Amino acid sequence: MALANAGFTVDAVCPSGHPLMVTGAHRRTYPYHGLRPLASIEAGIAAAKPDLLIPCDDLATRQLHQLHERARSRGAAGSATWALIERSLGARESFPVVYARTPFIEMAQAEGVRVPKTASITNRNDLDGWIARVGLPAVLKSNGSSGGEGVRVVRTAGEAVSAFRSLQAPPQLARGVKRALVDRDKTLILPSILRSRWEVNAQEFVVGREATSLIACWNGTVLASLHFEVIHKVSSSGPATVLRLVENAEMASATQKMVRRLGLSGMHGFDFMLEDSTGNAYLIEINPRTTQVGHLTLGPGRDLPAALYAAVTGQTAQPATKLTEKDIIVLFPGEWTRNPESTFLRSGHHDVPWEEPNLVRAGLEKHRKQSRWYSHRKLDKSVSTASVRHL
């Protein structure tokens, strides 16, 4: 919606039943098939002939990287496709780095960015050695995961061993089936069948508050940025539901350095920890795609869709009217479904897309399906009542 408002004509490749399909923000959608993802994306590109690609989740970015490799192997026949992907995401040299947690952190450290100690863990000996050198607690993270699913905070050696085995293991077929049936997302089916294993990384635990940035950039230059401190989350390792807009010079400097070093274009997220004792900002990872705040238009320098439109068209950026003067942003439907009585729903800016009532219903319906799967009957009932009252 924000991209369309900025001037873009929006087409999308997405699974059947995706919430985007109930909005008026797109011109056309093209089917995404979880068992034939690259063919789906390539067909969408061929039909839409886009000027820019914006991946909206980690899997989409990885598959664009794979499609880029396939296109380059075709020589001249694939040149238009790989050039479009590089134009949209940035230098191809960045592709192997943005999904490799340890090399990314090592690169950030070389750029003078403050980072926690991080190392790749391939076996039990590596894990024991890490604990002996760095100590506990620690954070274990798997490459190839997203949305907090591949993150574990461990406080004992036993927890570390258990988490390592869990994170390294291929996704369970039952989890893939759940994703396919409830979320209409078939992306875990193939990895679970192939028994693909993830690489695990250990990261030093920073005592502090989570923070996050989203950057619009072009050819290694930051065009616009949003920096937030995380106030509430769906769960300890889940997405944020309440954010506070902040100005943080260290976060801004870190993102500028990494965007320049990697030669990035498009939208990219960066996650930080703000250390309690010092306030220092530690860069902990990159999200090489847009995040759930990409649509927020918060004035000059903080309107990412307008900045990207200007970069693509060569025009001067025309930021939209500032969404709110409040610095507390309450994300929908996350906080509403986390706690329907949350005081932030009234005190902050509750970012509900009221202009698209079908999208509001779709967001709440997705929560209801997930609640039924996990038997969260009480929460499901309270949210259902709230949604009927307002819609």
What annotation goes with each model-predicted range?
Residues 1-91, 125, 129, 374-375, ...:
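ATP-binding N-terminal substructure of ATP-dependent carboxylate-amine bond-forming enzymes
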Residues 27, 78-150, 172-189:
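A conserved helix-loop-beta module that forms one wall/lid of the active-site cleft
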Residues 121, 151-156, 216-218, 245:
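Short beta-strand-to-turn element immediately C-terminal to the catalytic PLP-Schiff-base lysine
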Residues 148, 230-243, 287-301:
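Glycine-rich phosphate/pyrophosphate-binding beta-alpha loops
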Residues 164-233, 246-253, 274, 280-282:
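Phosphate-binding site of ATP-dependent enzymes
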Residues 215, 260-295:
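Conserved metal-phosphate-binding beta-hairpin within the catalytic cores
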Residues 226, 236-270:
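Oxyanion-binding "anion nests"
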Residues 306-391:
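Peripheral (often C-terminal) accessory segments that flank ATP-dependent C-N-forming ligase machineries
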